[in-house]
């Protein structure tokens, strides 16, 4: 009896302890506060665990078995570090200059090997094709020709041993499905089999969305619906993978402005008569809430808001509101700002207000860019981890919504000039 109790106690301790740890070392000038670890599901990073800094390090205990891509986010400065997990301890040392990361040293074997593999992959994708073309011009057995041949052989035969690295092996074996090569000979049927039969690491590999994009590129306007229907039937919408793939497809249709497909498969997702998973539920809700004629969900301004006394988006009184999601590092957005500035006073005379939410993480840059902007500005300083991305289905910047006085969406212009043209 005593042995049974002792064994049970040890099992309980094992279940409560970490599967592995992520250890990160960086100077206090980079960050003294919290670091948050994220795991990947499809194309969405999910917050997993956070840790406070102690003795110059963050030690994040990961409580579950996990193999795949990870991300660590530092809220104090908005920086992120990408890494992989093979359910083993990870060790990282950051060389920094203030908030800037100048070098990332991975001290664990898995991330060292993955970094090496990615370098080889880049050379194979970018350098090797150029070398092969040059080789055609110097096929003369000269010293230069022999050097070219040696480098080509090195790249073509430089394979990474992955026997003890299951995630790296999975990534290498299946990366071809997300290589973005439109002339690839992989058929849509092979893609469908890959999505349906691939191992459990597909969801955490970062390959799912680019592979879906490549799958869609192999269809035509005439075949896209039938191929997507085949895919969804094969992956089974009652499964978590099937629902995640449908959620990813809805995001892709929106990003690439495939409105016909978005409407068709949004209707399908909205009318499923069984329980749906979190991501599919979230995107269905977001699309519904940001469709023409929907009332845009309300938002409580942060302490960073300027040029208003209103506490919430709904508290801003105007005949029309132009809601803009942008970023200080987005070149397209920065080209829009002068156009808005030039027309802002004319809009105010028509009782039209502009409300801009920035997906920024750098406080100093945000303040510099917004200092002279007269309209309402706000930011959470969380970059793409901001709540806007999910609530308002923001997939790219700039994104615009035009609201009437009751906050009903009446337009979704692609740029500010398109909105101005409706006022003429």
PLM features: residue spans?
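Structural microenvironment flanking redox-active thiols in thiol-disulfide oxidoreductases
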Residues: 335-371, 384-388
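A non-transmembrane, solvent-exposed segment enriched in polar/low-complexity residues
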Residues: 19-193
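Short active-site neighborhood of thiol/selenol oxidoreductases, capturing the structured segment around
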Residues: 311-340, 353-357
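N-terminal targeting signals for export/organelle localization
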Residues: 222-295
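Bacterial Sec-dependent N-terminal signal peptides
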Residues: 1-24, 424
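Thiol/disulfide oxidoreductase modules built on the thioredoxin-like
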Residues: 384-424
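Helix-turn-helix repeat elements of alpha-solenoid scaffolds
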Residues: 146-152, 185, 218-226, 256-259
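N-terminal "domain-start" segment that seeds a small globular fold
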Residues: 274-314, 421-424
């Amino acid at each position: 009896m005593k042995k049974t109790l002792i064994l049970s106690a040890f099992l309980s301790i094992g279940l409560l302890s970490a599967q592995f740890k992520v250890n990160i070392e960086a100077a206090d000038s980079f960050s003294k506060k919290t670091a948050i670890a994220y795991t990947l599901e499809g194309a969405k990073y999910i917050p997993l665990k956070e840790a406070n800094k102690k003795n110059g390090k963050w030690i994040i205990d990961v409580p579950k078995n996990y193999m795949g891509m990870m991300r660590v986010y530092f809220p104090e400065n908005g920086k992120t570090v990408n890494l992989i997990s093979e359910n083993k301890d990870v060790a990282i040392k950051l060389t920094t200059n203030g908030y800037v990361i100048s070098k990332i040293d991975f001290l664990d074997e898995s991330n060292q090997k993955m970094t090496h593999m990615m370098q080889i992959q880049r050379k194979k994708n970018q350098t090797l094709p150029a070398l092969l073309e040059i080789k055609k011009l110097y096929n003369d057995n000269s010293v230069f020709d022999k050097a070219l041949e040696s480098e080509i052989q090195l790249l073509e035969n430089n394979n990474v041993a992955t026997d003890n690295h299951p995630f790296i092996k999975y990534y290498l074996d299946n990366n071809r499905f997300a290589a973005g090569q439109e002339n690839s000979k992989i058929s849509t049927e092979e893609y469908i089999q890959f999505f349906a039969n691939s191992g459990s690491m597909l969801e955490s590999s970062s390959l799912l969305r680019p592979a879906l994009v490549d799958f869609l590129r192999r269809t035509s306007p005439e075949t896209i619906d039938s191929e997507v229907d085949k895919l969804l039937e094969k992956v089974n919408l009652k499964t978590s993978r099937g629902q995640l793939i449908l959620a990813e497809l809805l995001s892709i249709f929106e990003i690439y402005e495939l409105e016909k497909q978005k409407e068709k498969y949004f209707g399908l997702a909205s009318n499923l008569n069984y329980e749906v998973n979190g991501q599919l539920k979230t995107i269905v809700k977001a699309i519904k809430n940001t469709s023409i004629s929907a009332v845009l969900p309300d938002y409580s301004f942060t302490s960073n808001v300027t040029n208003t006394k209103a506490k919430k988006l709904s508290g801003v009184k105007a005949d029309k509101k132009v809601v803009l999601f942008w970023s200080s590092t987005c070149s397209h957005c920065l080209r829009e700002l002068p156009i808005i500035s030039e027309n802002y006073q004319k809009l105010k005379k028509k009782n039209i207000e502009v409300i801009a939410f920035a997906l920024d993480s750098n406080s100093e840059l945000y303040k510099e860019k917004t200092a002279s902007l007269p309209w309402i500005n706000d930011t959470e300083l969380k970059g793409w981890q901001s709540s806007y991305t999910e609530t308002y289905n923001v997939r790219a910047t700039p994104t615009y919504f035009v609201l009437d006085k009751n906050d009903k969406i009446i337009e979704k212009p692609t740029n500010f000039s398109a909105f101005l043209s409706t006022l003429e």
